[in-house]
UniProtKB/Swiss-Prot annotation:
PANTHER family: QUINOLINATE SYNTHASE, CHLOROPLASTIC, QUINOLINATE SYNTHETASE A. The lineage of its organism: Archaea, Methanobacteriati, Methanobacteriota, Thermococci, Thermococcales. The keyword Nucleotide-binding does not apply. The gene is nadA. GO terms for cellular component: cytoplasm. This is Quinolinate synthase. Iminosuccinate binds at residues 21, 38, 109-111, 126, 196-198, 213. It comes from Pyrococcus horikoshii (strain ATCC 700860 / DSM 12428 / JCM 9974 / NBRC 100139 / OT-3). Its cofactor is [4Fe-4S] cluster.
Length: 300
């Protein structure tokens, strides 16, 4: 059985669209109808004509698609496609911060659960966090769950950022160290460094550019050779878009287990059996939708 052919057949039969994140396996990227970062995927999810959305990404992304498309069927091909960082932030963390800073707006990275988003004033992605926080009429902002992105936002906006929880992080980006920076410069002396803002502050400081994955794609045209400090599959995406340029992963072991849970086989099974359906309780979805839509409005 040719899985790709079967997926294309079922996709047509179900009137489905496949949305994939930049960190997906190469073969999954190759069959997707749209590939993007969290912000691009959220925007694309507001313009879906299909009846079924198959989300090749982790659970919080599929939840966001469902929140923005309550009347459509949203499928996630694997229950293992979870985000460890999103699960670090509990509602209690937000409520505790609100007790200490009652007037501070709650800004949540989209890498959070739907339940947490219901308590947010606005959501952000790594692509628009600085822009959105700058526009907020407050010098103190509660921000979660990524402490490294919180550091970057504080540096770029000059505002007091309260990270919730205090140690929230992405285990993939947390791996990158100053040793990786030194090694990258030795191995590729002509390359510049593109670094994701989920990396630790010491690594961020060595960047030629700090950008979300969408930002990396936009700015890759500025130089001919890059070392990429983010999930390794981003290198495949960049090489495909810019075949004339050179891209190197800063670490081969920088891979997200949750993202890799999505395969051609389970995308096929997902379309065949219409599983696993993503559901978000109406009250949570209604509140979270406000925060997501406010983000989309503030970052046009």
């Amino acid at each position: 059985m040719d899985l790709v052919e079967e997926i294309l057949r079922l996709k047509e039969e179900r009137n489905a669209i496949i949305l994939a994140h930049n960190y997906q396996l190469p073969e999954v990227q190759d069959i997707a109808d749209f590939i993007g970062d969290s912000l691009e995927l959220a925007r694309r999810a507001t313009r879906v004509d299909a009846d079924v959305i198959v989300f090749a990404g982790v659970d919080f992304m599929a939840e966001t698609a469902k929140i923005l498309n309550p009347d459509k069927v949203v499928l996630i091909p694997s229950r293992e496609a979870t985000c460890a960082m999103a699960n670090m932030l509990k509602v209690e963390h937000i409520l505790e911060a609100k007790r200490k800073y009652p007037n501070a707006p709650v800004v949540l990275y989209v890498n959070s659960t739907a339940e947490a988003k219901a308590y947010a004033d606005v959501t952000v992605t790594s692509a628009n966090a600085v822009e959105v926080v700058k526009k907020l009429d407050s010098d103190v902002v509660i921000f979660g769950p990524d402490k490294n992105l919180a550091h970057y936002v504080a540096k770029m906006t000059g505002k007091k950022i309260i990270p919730v929880p205090s140690k929230g992080h992405c285990y993939v980006h947390q791996k990158f160290t100053l040793d990786d920076v030194e090694r990258a410069k030795k191995l590729h002396p002509n390359a510049k460094l593109m670094i994701h803002p989920e990396c630790i502050p010491e690594v961020q400081e060595k960047a030629d550019i700090i950008a979300s994955t969408g930002g990396m794609i936009k700015r890759a045209c500025e130089w001919d050779e890059w070392v990429v400090f983010t999930e390794r599959e981003m290198v495949y995406r960049l090489r495909k878009l810019y075949p004339q340029k050179k891209f190197y992963p800063a670490r081969e072991d920088a891979f997200c287990i949750g993202m890799k849970a999505i395969t051609l086989k389970n995308i096929y099974e997902s379309l065949k059996d219409m599983k696993y359906k993503v559901e978000v309780p109406e009250e949570i979805a209604r509140k979270a939708r406000k925060a997501i839509e406010r983000m989309l409005e503030m970052s046009k």
